[in-house]
Curated annotation (Swiss-Prot):
Keyword Ion transport: no
Family, per entry: Belongs to the bacterial ribosomal protein bL28 family.
A Pfam match: Ribosomal_L28
Gene this protein is translated from: rpmB
GO BP term, pick one: translation
SUPFAM superfamilies listed in its UniProt record: L28p-like
Domain of life assignment: Bacteria
Family annotation (HAMAP family): Ribosomal_bL28
UniProt organism field: Thermotoga maritima (strain ATCC 43589 / DSM 3109 / JCM 10099 / NBRC 100826 / MSB8)
Protein name per UniProt: Large ribosomal subunit protein bL28
NCBIfam families, per the entry: L28
Keyword list, A-Z: Ribonucleoprotein, Ribosomal protein
InterPro entries (alphabetical): Bacterial_rp_bL28, Ribosomal_bL28, Ribosomal_bL28/bL31-like_sf, Ribosomal_bL28_bact-type, Ribosomal_bL28_sf
């Protein structure tokens, strides 16, 4: 399964870890993905891998669940 946001397509990017002596070694910057249940526009519920920036910006609507009446 790809480490990619299913909403915006954000994917891992390569970069460098830079030490104090300015030596560079390669590393990966990965998106902060969360598995959430999402309510789709047609009303169905689907589990998706979504980055936190999409959750915070409101691009997806989280499924809250059934509320039981007491």
């Amino acid at each position: 399964m790809a480490k990619r946001c299913e909403v915006c397509g954000k994917a891992p990017r390569s970069g460098n870890t830079v030490s104090h002596s300015d030596k560079k070694s390669g590393r990966w910057f990965r998106p902060n993905l969360q598995k959430v249940r999402v309510v789709l526009p047609d009303g169905t519920i689907k589990r998706m891998r979504v980055c936190t920036s999409c959750l915070k910006s409101g691009k997806v609507k989280k499924y809250v669940g059934q509320v039981s009446e007491v």
